[in-house]
Amino acid sequence: MNISELSIRRPVMASVLTIIILLFGFIGYSYLGVREYPSVDNPIISVTCSYPGANADVIENQITEPLEQNINGIPGIRSMSSVSSQGQSRITVEFELSVDLETAANDVRDKVSRAQRYLPRDCDPPTVTKADADATPILMVTIQSDKRSLLELSEIADLTVKEQLQTINNVSGVQIWGEKRYSMRLWLDPAKMAGYGITPVDIKNALDRENVELPSGSIEGNTTELTIRTMGLMHTTQEFNDLVVREASNRIIRLSDVGRAELGPQDTRSYMKMNGIPMVGVVVIPQPGANHIDIADAVYQRMETMKKDLPDDVVTSYGFDNTRFIRASIDEVRQTVYEAFILVIIIIFLFLRNWRVTLIPCIVIPVSLIGTFFLMYVAGFSINVLSMLAVVLSVGLVVDDAIVMTENIYIRIERGMTPKEAGIEGAKEIFFAVISTSVTLIAVFFPIVFMEGMTGRLFREFSMGISGAVVISTFAALTITPMLATKLLVRQERKSWFYSKTEPFFVGMNNFYQRTLAGFLRRRWVALPLIALMVGLIGWLWRAIPAEMAPLEDRSQISINTRGSEGATYEYLRDYTEDINRLVDSLVPEAKSVTARVSSGSGNVRIALTDIAERKRSQMEIAEELSAAVRTKTKARAFVQQQSTFGGRRGNMPVQYVLQATGIERLQEVLPEFMRKVYESPVFQMADVDLKFSKPEARIIINRDKSNLLGVSTRDIAQTLQYGLSGQRMGYFYMNGKQYEILAEINRQQRNKPADLQSIYVRSDKGEMIQLDNLIALEENVAPPQLYHYNRFLSATVSAGLAKGKTIGQGLDEMDRIAAETLGDDFRTALAGDSKEFRESSSSLMFAFLLAILLIYLILAAQFESFKDPLVIMLTVPLAIAGALVFMAANGQTMNIFSQIGIIMLIGLVAKNGILIVEFANQKQEAGIDKLHAIEEASLQRLRPILMTSASTILGLLPLTVATGEGANGRIAMGIAVVGGMVVSTLLTLYIVPAIYSYVSTDRSKK
């Protein structure tokens, strides 16, 4: 007695099992988290170290190099990159997916602490954070007021909003855009300092002496104890202005005599505006792999409770929220599930024309899908675009077994058997075929589970979701389906009006197939050249269809990055960015908000568009118009960018090509020629390279002999310049319970040209004031403003945006061609960002594809106890792939992760049809019918179930092919590939399988 017979004989048991599946499914669904995609972010740790005033070369040699040298030995590092720029070193360490984020952070902290002894004494201690320094924020809270200054708003943002938001679980960091943090700025006048015989070093020494508070002990009496506190710290502008710098000739020289103290912003070279209004923005950056929706919900909740703590005149709003796209995208896929369910039920009814028979699959579909949610919960998965796509695809799949089982039982009832007898016999006949097709389908997705890297992580949930649905649907098809069939199905003495009207069509279809199949089998040799033609078509189209990682989605967001030429001032770039902002306002009426930010050296205009349903133009069309418009603004450079589907790095273009060399001189030599060819290439719309050699610098050459004769050391000169020009932190002061920096430098207007250095004086060891001009010579030069390393090598990363109609695959091929023409043997190339993921995923998917074919062949060989019979089924695979590629090419689709997974799915889907025919033909042969007649009869008998299951799969996927709204492009890519493959393969399989079977299969009638 098999499980189907047991369910028929014990219907209550079968019902209880079904209720348990539904119950656990609902419980699992209620506990599942929601996110856009499965967690595929590599663990990334950033190390940042500041050394104010130091140039890129000093930072590279004294900070970046020792840190990298120590970090490099940590196991599990995937890549390590660094940027050494003016005053700061930033190292980004990316680990393999298998490495735990906490373990990685601890390893890096350990290595950084060991390296600290090699760093300059006066640099800030390195900080280690669990996030990419270039990670994209997911949400921005804006803070504005018509009564308060940006300094006050920044304080509110820091003390109230940031403090609350950074404690949210899985938040890596909270930044304040446009922050004007309080600082005590000491502006020094070099002429007055020279008159009083004061140097910047004297100011630093005076602060170290006077702005100090040390523990002073206590006074103990017989009954009381008093703690002594020496009030040595300065808090107000007046106290700093009254600071005694030195005493000379019975005269006290105060800071106010040689300069002034004022409470001002720490960073004077940055600002942020939203919709033209200056304000500050608090942005939230998630940890790698964090659930963005959970974080956003927590932010909304905290902001709601925080409103009562904010002053009445302070208004908060949301500048952007990336999770709106995620929520809408998930809702769109949910809607598709319902559409697919309705379409599948309609097609089943049209084929069976009996509401009782149709009711059985109607029950099986929800049972299979709801039960899948419990398996997803047990596996630790989430509700995301891919797991929901798995549910959509499952709607058409899970119904197949139920249809085949129900139809087989119904045929017997119509022949006059009792429902119970028909159920037992019908289930027994189809039992093996149901298990075979299900095992085959699971075998397709099994290789995906073992795929490494981002692709494997992405589609693990997808493949496990479908596999889980197939397992539950198989169980339902073998238990509840035969039980329901015996309870619901009865022999119809009189056919319905609808049945009578439509039956001639089905009879005619059967007769047409019988005639055409007989004709095809008489010329069955045609099948072989037809398969060869399909294989050739696959080879041609596979190369012809452009490839990319994933199609670009309309996320209702566009970003424009602005860059000034090296040496351009902050004010120059600010004016240019505001010009771009005005351009956006005039060209994009669909903009909901426009946020402009400028800091030293770079600017950004971020456009949040209205929802897709509310505008006529797509994000891509708007970006195309903006790209053309910003090219006319030639005072500086602007790049229009759109966020990639699988990407979190801020502001990166799709093509990231890294050139590595052993010396900076070789890069300087080769880069101009390489970039010229990139600019001339029609494949790229725009291009840039991070390594520049154009930042002007004034080099100070010290006359050491003269300096030593006059009693001035190199250290004296360097310190005087450091404290006078670099805006060096000279200490801290406290205000409102918070610590702020004391910054000192010479007035900007008194040091705006190299000749102004003459007015700076240095004190000799004899106490004499010596003009710096007597000891140094000035030499103007150019140098790289930033130095880059990639995997320890000096590097330059060429970033390129793609021309219209071009894909990342074509872009990388073009870069490879230019590199082959331009670079010598002493260069190495590497890929970064989306480019690296694309190349790795391509090879990974090809491995999964070949493994799926091999696994299915082996499983079928085991099922049929023959190495020949599976060949009949496997030869239908080229038909499906060719169909998919033809439909993709006709609809302008690219070869991407979604379409490739669809193609892998097709292997299992078309194999199902072949199994049904071959299994029945083998049974007929064993009953004594010869091979040719057996395959003819089996094909005719299986025609309706094959057409019905294929039509249900196709219609279940049809909503994907016409998807609109958020995240539609990925769904369309997958839908077109699978529907195209199914349409072509279903029509051809009905003829090719019988023809190949007659040639290849084992002759069982003689046994």
Briefly describe each language-model feature range:
Residues 531-629, 633, 638, 674, ...:
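Juxtamembrane segments of multi-pass membrane proteins
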Residues 1-341, 383, 457, 636, ...:
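Membrane-proximal extracytoplasmic
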Residues 5-12, 288-291, 327-384, 450-454, ...:
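Interfacial segments of transmembrane alpha-helices in multi-pass membrane proteins
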Residues 395-409, 431-450, 457-499, 605, ...:
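Transmembrane alpha-helices and their membrane-interface boundaries in multi-pass membrane transporters
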Residues 319, 326, 330, 406, ...:
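Helix-loop junctions and hydrophobic alpha-helical segments within the transmembrane domains
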